[in-house]
Every structure is written in structure tokens, then in C-alpha cells.
């Protein structure tokens, strides 16, 4: 069976989050691994329950890599990478919701890059929000 950790995270996504996670997975900025994209596409057929015999690792491998000899280590790596993306997505969603911390992080980065004018502009905006 596919990793219960990965399926546990995915099963808790709302339909909107699951769809958005698919966009996250397919974004070349966040993921360049085509196998991870294919695994997401395969798993979405089973959302949200993820209870099916077709989730056995050998069956998943056969569907993703038709005609190739089963390689547990390779499949586990693909599953692990999708799991890491799910964790990154959750962190990203949380980051987007927290305007204050997002602003503080932006200020740190602007300051580090010595972008004083832009820093002062955003500093004033953030100060007003506090």
C-alpha cells in the first residue's frame, strides 16, 4: 500500500485544497519531477478515501511505469517526493494566510538586499496594519 503518511495528508485536504495541490505539484517552480506529477494524477482518482486495491505499490508502479520491472526503492522515492510537496503545500497555505509574518519576511529580504526605498514603503504599510 502507498505510504499512509502521504495518503493521510491528502485525505485531509478539502476538495479545493486537493485541486490547488494538483496545481502546486504541476508547477515547474515547485516540482520538476514528472513521475511525481504522474503519481498525483494517479492518486486523484481515489480521493478522498484512498481505499482501493489499485493503491498497492506494485499496481501503482505498473500504472505509472507500464512495462518496467518493479523497483520498490524508486517508487518509494517518488512517493516520498510527493509527500514532501504535500508538506510544502501546507506550509505555503499557512504562509499565505499570515500577512504579518509574510510582511516581516519580505522586509527581512528587502533589507538583506539593501532595497531601502522598497523596504521603507512596505515597512510603512505593515506598521499601519499592526
What annotation goes with each model-predicted range?
Residues 1-130:
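Flexible inter-repeat linkers and adjacent short helices
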Amino acid at each position: 500500500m502507498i505510504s499512509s503518511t502521504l495518503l493521510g495528508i491528502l485525505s485531509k485536504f478539502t476538495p479545493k485544497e486537493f485541486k490547488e495541490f494538483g496545481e502546486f505539484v504541476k508547477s515547474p517552480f515547485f516540482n520538476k519531477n514528472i513521475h511525481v506529477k504522474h503519481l498525483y494524477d494517479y492518486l486523484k482518482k481515489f480521493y478522498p478515501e484512498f481505499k482501493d486495491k489499485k493503491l498497492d505499490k506494485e499496481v501503482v508502479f505498473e500504472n505509472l511505469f507500464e512495462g518496467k520491472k518493479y523497483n520498490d526503492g524508486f517508487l518509494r522515492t517518488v512517493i516520498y517526493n510527493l509527500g514532501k510537496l504535500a508538506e510544502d503545500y501546507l506550509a505555503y497555505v499557512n504562509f499565505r494566510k499570515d500577512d504579518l509574518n509574510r510582511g516581516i519576511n519580505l522586509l527581512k529580504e528587502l533589507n538583506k538586499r539593501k532595497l531601502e526605498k522598497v523596504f521603507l514603503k512596505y515597512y510603512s504599510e505593515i506598521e499601519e496594519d499592526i
